[in-house]
């Protein structure tokens, strides 16, 4: 039996098995994309074009964020190739797959993140527990990863302020303290421990018969599956949700 897991699948199962079931067993997705997700997707597309030395969309919030990336991140030193998909065998019958935001010329994975947190230092502290970092290091066999962190603006549009005026203020607001590039390092022992953890989790996912809910996660974050969490049945008529074309629509593999 072949099991394929992505970093998102692993993180989702650890946070809430019920959400994992809805998203990756029943393959459901919300029909509408949240504003935050839309901005994040546009920002990533802009950064991809920057790394390819191509033109990008300077409009809107995502455009101003990309301008800050281009100005404050030393991205030209990486000689990076963006959007690198992978499918790597971790153990017998278990494969990790996904997409690196970029891979440098010397094989270091690069990941771009946005955050609404007011303190980038606190966000950086959380990277010590980030599965995605370790997974990307495992698949690239690199002891180091580069994370770029873009803080979303904390300023809001004024009541009598035009969109153009607001975006101009956002451009002026961005400074090096709002945009960071962080080197994350893991020892060989830490990466081996993560590999063993993923193998164990994959076994749990294969064998589980009951995808239980984690109410602690519900209390901390808003879940896009909240409206069907308690009463979803495979034969029910879906409102606000649809079946995905495939389990990992973000990938081509």
Label for each model-derived stretch:
Residues 1-108, 151, 158:
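Metal-dependent nuclease catalytic cores that hydrolyze phosphodiester bonds in DNA/RNA
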Residues 4-5, 138-253:
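Metal-dependent nuclease catalytic regions and adjoining charged, substrate-binding loops involved
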Residues 11-12, 102, 136-139, 220-221:
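A general structural signal for short secondary-structure junctions and capping/turn motifs
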Residues 20-26, 113-114, 172-182:
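Short acidic (Asp/Glu) and glycine-rich catalytic loops that position anionic groups and cofactors
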Residues 26, 51-55, 114-117, 138-141:
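Hydrophobic/aromatic-lined pockets within catalytic cores
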Residues 36, 122, 126, 191:
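Flexible, glycine- and charge-enriched loops at secondary-structure boundaries
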Residues 87-133, 139:
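Non-catalytic protein-protein interaction segments used by genome-maintenance enzymes to assemble
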């Amino acid at each position: 039996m072949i099991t394929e897991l992505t970093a998102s699948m692993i993180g989702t199962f650890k946070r809430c098995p019920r959400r994992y079931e809805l998203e990756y067993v029943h393959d459901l997705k919300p029909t509408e994309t949240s504003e935050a997700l839309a901005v994040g997707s546009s920002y990533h597309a802009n950064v991809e074009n920057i790394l390819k030395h191509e033109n990008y969309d300077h409009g809107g919030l995502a455009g101003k964020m990309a301008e800050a990336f281009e100005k404050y991140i030393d991205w030209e030193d990486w000689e990076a190739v963006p959007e690198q998909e992978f499918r790597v065998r971790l153990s017998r019958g278990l494969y990790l797959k996904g997409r690196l935001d970029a891979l440098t010329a010397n094989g270091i994975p690069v990941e771009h993140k946005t955050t609404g947190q007011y303190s980038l230092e606190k966000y950086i502290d959380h990277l010590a527990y980030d599965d995605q970092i370790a997974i990307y290091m495992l698949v690239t066999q690199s002891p180091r990863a580069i994370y770029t962190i873009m803080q979303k603006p904390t300023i809001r549009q004024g009541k009598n302020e035009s969109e153009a005026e607001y975006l101009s203020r956002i451009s002026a607001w961005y400074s090096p303290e709002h945009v960071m590039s962080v080197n994350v390092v893991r020892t060989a022992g830490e990466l081996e421990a993560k590999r063993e953890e993923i193998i164990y989790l994959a076994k749990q996912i294969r064998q589980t018969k009951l995808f239980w809910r984690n109410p602690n996660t519900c209390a901390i974050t808003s879940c896009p599956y909240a409206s069907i969490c308690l009463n979803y049945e495979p034969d029910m008529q879906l409102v606000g949700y649809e079946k995905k074309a495939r389990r990992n629509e973000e990938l081509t593999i």
